[in-house]
Every structure is written in C-alpha cells, then in structure tokens.
Regions:
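Short, solvent-exposed turn/loop segments enriched in Gly/Ser/Thr/Pro and often Arg
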Residues: 207-215, 257-259, 372-374
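N-terminal chloroplast transit peptides
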Residues: 1-25, 29-105
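Alpha-helical recognition segments enriched in aromatics with Gly/Pro capping
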Residues: 126-177, 192, 242, 263-491
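N-terminal mitochondrial targeting presequences
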Residues: 42, 115-135
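N-terminal alpha-helical targeting/anchoring segments
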Residues: 110, 126-129, 176, 194-202, ...
Length: 669
C-alpha cells in the first residue's frame, strides 16, 4: 500500500517509543511552548494504543501551575490522532521563577501537521486564571504578575495593605534643567500603564513622582543662562507637564520637589550617622558602603567592582572610594541650606529616600524607573533607606528587610520595576552622536499618540529601537484604527435605525431570542478581545500583545461596515456595538484616546502634510491632475503622480469617500 512520506513519518514516530524528557532535539511538528529549562513527559496513549511520544525542546515560556493538572494537547492533522502530555512536576521549576520577555507575536500554534494548545482545567493558561486557587488576586479577581528586579523574576503582586487594597508607588522623576527626551517618554508611559492597570484591577493607588530641583546640572545651566535656579526649574517643570500630558499620561497623585524636603533630608543624614552608616568630612556627609555587606544586592555589583571601577572619583576624605555623598558642602554661586554640618545642599540619592519616607512611609509597594537607575541611584537609595530603619545589623537588605524601630520586618521596596533602554537607529542615544531627540521635537512632526503607540509596541522591559520608520508605521496604524472606529460608529447609527424601522413594521412584539449569526459572533469576539487584553496586561504589562489583540475586531468591524444587506446584515448592530466597545476599552486600558474621531484623524493628516512639506492646495491639485490623466487614459502619468506623493507619505485614493490619506514613507531612516 502506498503511503505519502508524511504519513510514513507520522506512523514511524508513533511506533517508536521515545520520551519527551530524553529528547535533545527540536522536532519540526511538536514543540513544548511552555517550559523554560524544564522537560515534559507523556501522560496518556493515543486512541489506537500506540505509545505517544515526540521530540521536544524546552520552550521559552513557562506555563504557570506546572505539574498541577497543566497539560499539552497535540493533534496530528494527518493521522487525526490526539496526544496529551503533562508537565513533569519533579523537573519543572516553580511558577515563580524568571519568565523571559513576553513575545508579542505569540499566537495559537499551528506548525506543520500538528495543532496544539495548553489547557488548565479547560482554560487557556494565563496569569489571570492559572492556579487561581493559589495565586493571590486583585479586587477584580485577577492576578497581576510583575517582574521584580530584586528577585530577577516575575512574581504575583501582593501589596503591603492587601486587606484595604491600597498600593503605594514611587517613580523617579526628571532633573528639571532641560526639555524631556524620548527616554523619559519611555519611562513615564510604562509606569502610566502600570498605574492604569492597578487602578483597573480595583486598587487604591497613591502614585508619587518627584522632581529633582537642585543638582549640578541645574546649577550649571542656570549660570549659563544667567537666571536663577528657581526660574529655570519652574520653566522646565511646566514644559515637562506639557510633554507628558500630550502623551496621554495621567498626572500622579503627588509630585514633590526635593527642595521642599530639606528638613527630612538632613534628619535622615543625622540618623545614618548615629547608626554608624554615614560620616561627615569637612562639611560633606558620605554613606559608608562597607557598613552594609549586602550593598549591591539590587544591581548585582560587588564592592570590589566599585573599588576597581574607573568611574569612581578619588577623594582622600572617603573611607572607601565607592562611598557616595549624602550632603555636599556649600560652594560659591550655588544654592545652599543650613545643616548640622554647615551650609550645603543634598546629594542626589538621599532626596528620593527622604521624600519616600516623608510621604509614603518607610516601606512602599513599587519603586520604578529606567534601567539606567538600577546603579548607582536605586542601589544607593536602597542602602540609605534600609540602613536608616535598622536598629541592628540583622536582616537582609531589601530581602525581608532589617529589624526596624517600628516592629515587623518589612523591605524598603516590595517590587523594584525597571523599563528598558531606548536606542536610536540601533545606537545609544547621545547628543554627541546627533541622535538625541526631545519629546517636543518628535511631536512637532508626529502625533503624540503615535509616539505612545510606538512605545507600547515593545514590552516595557525590552530595549526599544527608535526609528523614523517605526513612527511612520505607528502613525499609519493609528489612522487605520481611528478611521475604522469613525466608520463603524456611522454604520452602527445606520444599523440601529434600520433595526428600529424593522421593529416598527412588525405588528406583534417578537419573543427574545439568544443572539445568532453575526450578532453572536460579534459578541463572542468582543468577549475574547476583552479577555485577551486583560490577560496580556496582567502578565507583566504585555502591551504589545494587548494592542495586537485589536487586529481581529478591527478587521471584523471593517467587514461589518461593508455588510449592509441580506442575511449577513441580520444582527449587525449588536456586533458593531459590542466590538466598538471592546476596541475602546482596550484603547483606554493602555492610555490611548478612547474616542479620537475626526479630530484626531484631521491632526494626523495635518502632520503628514507638514512632514511632506505640502499644503492642501498641493494635494488638491495632484488629485485633479490625476483625475484628468485617468480620464485621458494616461495611466502612466496617473501612476507617476501617485508614486510621487506616495514617496512623501501621501496616498492618493482611487475610490471611496477619501480623496487621500497618510501613508508610511518607504525610506527607512
């Protein structure tokens, strides 16, 4: 009997006993997607009694609840046989170990002749529903998994005041001496999403973001400009608010300035000196890193690295070259405040520790910032705050805390959260390289919402590559999204009017029936979209996956807009209504405008013309010239005009209601 080669390979695989756990290679048809550094074993046999087996390679993701009923179902589409595999609890790490960055392109797997999916008690595995009986949940019943830099892994989020559902979050703000750049945009968009997610999950969040308003850079810039430091600071704080507000970020609960907490800073310095963690020298106060053997636990750096580090300034007054300044003695031309050690000003690191303790308390739930702040800023903050609360040397730094004067042991910060770097055209952003961009420089050419969309398209912990092409694509995607919403809402009004007209023609009131056809499909897709977005954001703020979930409902909405007659139009209004609501809910959850409408589309068109160096009259003239060429059947001229404007980012349309729309510029810069 002749067998197709694929059939022979499938039968050969089924007849050959082989354990998943012992396979060193990756089979092209079967892949274990959920286990990192783990293995899998066969759990059942196929229907014809043959042993179930396949080659597998440890995947890049771990499935939560491993070893507790979590299974991998495999169906061979050629032989029609189903196999079931379970994770080996003895070989799989616990669910709390480090997960890699989420893959925004991960979709239901269909490779070769095999379709597979993970199931946990019949549900798709996700942080929101995996191990629901053991994982802590938020007020809305979900579990938020958050990557903790201190632990180097994702953990279920549990606030200190879980009973009252209160969360305290502190994010390091800007040093206000210049306009904010796209690196700042990355930080504050990321933590705006976290703030929104915590609020959506039902937590009462106190969000604090400071301003460093006394610093060497501020003093230098004020002297260069010939203005007072206070005037410079006020001007750039206003500019910061304008830029960040334009990106759609919610204002924090409070925004303290360092200079408003000088008394708290000097008190903290005194306490550290009394406890033996700091010392004064000629009007300066330094923190002694040798007093804390655990110093470096957050960044993973050792004291030996600091001593040998080339960036450590040599100062003979220091006990250790790595000791850092808590208080700086006064210098001519600098703002100063009185202190027990004479006139001076605070160091950078002590400011955040003092403000956190004064406003939020000795322990907080979340401390955030850019990855560049892990060392030295956050490492030094952790050392200062932990040491100030210790009444002895017991306890571990940041890992359960030391014993405090107020009772139970509690770490300074429960969850350290950091976002990844921003690169420009794959290079480090630097003024010397000429690739340094402020937020307002970018938003003069591109819509702020496009910049936010671009930032959301990369997971917050991953490095992001800023390119002009990425912004072009973000702008194009936004135009498609909001154009679809505008057309869908118009179609919804039309569909509801037709439903009302049909109902008026019916003499007897119809009995309520469950939704069927398009209505049922629309309701289901809307529910699936909402669930997918909730699951993505609960899994360490996976914004790429959340916004990717919009693709299916947007495509369906476009189909519904063009479906106006026949049986397919029955239930159209219900599907439109639910899908529009699902899209708008997703937009709101990641901080994008819920209702952009024609206003946002018009702004996108205006910015396109500005980038292209064109006016409305130029476009109208091109449209007219192209129409004449087409009427004369001069299609070569028509194509030339279209391509000329397309290269500038203006797509001339051949039909429909639109005459032209923004388009992605092909040239990648």
């Amino acid at each position: 009997m002749y067998l197709h080669p694929r059939e022979r390979r499938a039968r050969h695989a089924e007849a050959r006993p082989h354990s998943l756990a012992s396979s060193p290679t990756r089979h092209p048809d079967v892949r274990a997607e959920a286990v990192e550094q783990g293995t899998m074993r066969a759990a059942s046999s196929s229907r014809d009694g043959h042993a179930t087996h396949a080659h597998a390679h440890p995947g890049r993701r771990r499935l939560r609840g491993a070893g507790r009923g979590c299974k991998l179902e495999v169906r061979n589409r050629i032989t029609r046989r189903r196999f079931m595999y379970t994770l080996n609890p003895a070989l799989v790490p616990s669910p709390s170990l480090t997960d890699p960055l989420p893959n925004p392109r991960r979709r239901p797997i269909r490779l070769g002749g095999v379709q597979r999916r993970f199931t946990t008690s019949g549900a798709v595995a996700s942080p929101a529903n995996a191990d629901a009986d053991t994982l802590p949940t938020a007020p809305n019943g979900q579990t938020l998994m958050l990557h903790n830099t201190m632990k180097r892994k994702k953990e279920p989020f549990v606030p200190r005041d879980a009973e009252q559902n209160k969360v305290s979050m502190y994010v390091c703000g800007v040093t206000v001496y210049d306009y904010s750049h796209i690196g700042h945009a990355r930080v504050y968009v990321a933590f705006d999403v976290l703030y929104r997610q915590l609020t959506r999950m039902g937590y009462d969040v106190t969000y604090c973001r400071n301003f460093t308003d006394v610093d060497d850079k501020i003093i230098k810039r004020a002297n260069e400009n010939g203005e007072e430091c206070d005037a410079l600071v006020d001007r750039f704080i206003d500019a910061f608010h304008e830029d960040i507000d334009a990106l759609g970020c919610v204002r924090p609960t409070m925004e303290p300035r360092a200079t408003d907490h000088i008394g708290d800073i000097t008190a903290l310095c005194e306490r550290l000196i009394e406890k033996g963690y700091a010392y004064s020298a000629d009007g300066d106060v330094y923190f002694s890193v040798d007093a804390l053997p655990e110093y470096g636990s957050l960044s993973g750096r050792k004291l030996e690295d600091n001593r040998a580090g080339e960036r450590v300034a040599v100062d003979t007054r220091k006990k250790n070259p790595a000791d850092f300044a808590l208080w700086k003695a006064a210098k001519p031309g600098e703002p100063t405040w009185d202190s027990p050690w004479g006139a001076g000003r605070p160091g950078w690191h002590i400011e955040c520790s003092a403000m956190i303790e004064s406003i939020l308390g000795k322990s907080i739930d979340i401390h955030g910032g850019g990855q560049d702040l892990v060392f030295p800023h956050h490492e030094n903050e952790l050392a200062q705050s932990t040491a100030s609360c210790r009444c002895c040397t017991e306890g571990e730094l940041g890992l359960g805390g030391g014993k405090t004067n107020e009772g139970p042991e509690e770490p300074f910060v429960r969850y350290w959260v950091h976002n990844g770097f921003v690169k420009v055209d794959s290079e480090k952003m630097s003024k010397s390289l000429g690739n340094f961009f402020t937020i307002r420089e970018v938003t003069e050419r591109y819509h702020p919402t496009a910049l936010r969309w671009m930032l959301l398209g990369t997971h917050y912990r991953a490095p992001i590559n800023y390119t002009q092409r990425a912004l072009e694509e973000a702008s194009d995607r936004l135009y498609y999204l909001y154009q679809t919403l505008v057309e869908s809402k118009d179609a919804l009004v039309d569909a509801q009017a037709k439903d009302a007209e049909t109902a008026g023609e019916t003499k007897t009131k119809p009995k309520p029936k469950p939704p069927t056809g398009i209505a049922a499909e629309g309701i289901d897709l809307a529910a699936e979209t909402n669930a997918a977005v909730d699951s993505a954001l609960a899994d360490d703020l996976n914004t790429p996956l959340a916004i990717a979930s919009l693709s299916a409902p947007l495509k369906t909405l476009n189909d519904l807009v063009s479906t106006k007659k026949g049986k397919k139009a029955v239930g159209r209004s219900v599907a439109l209504r639910d899908l529009i609501a699902a899209v708008e809910t997703t937009l709101e959850s990641v901080g994008l405008p819920r209702e952009g409408g024609e206003g946002l589309l018009e702004e996108l068109r205006e910015l396109t013309l500005r980038r292209a160096g064109l006016t409305r009259d130029d476009v109208d003239a091109a449209v007219a010239a192209r129409a004449e060429a087409r009427a004369a059947k001069d299609f070569a001229e028509s194509d030339r005009i279209r391509d000329e404007f397309g290269a500038k980012g203006v797509a001339l349309m051949d039909g429909g209601n639109q005459v032209w729309r923004p388009a992605t510029v092909v040239d990648d810069k």
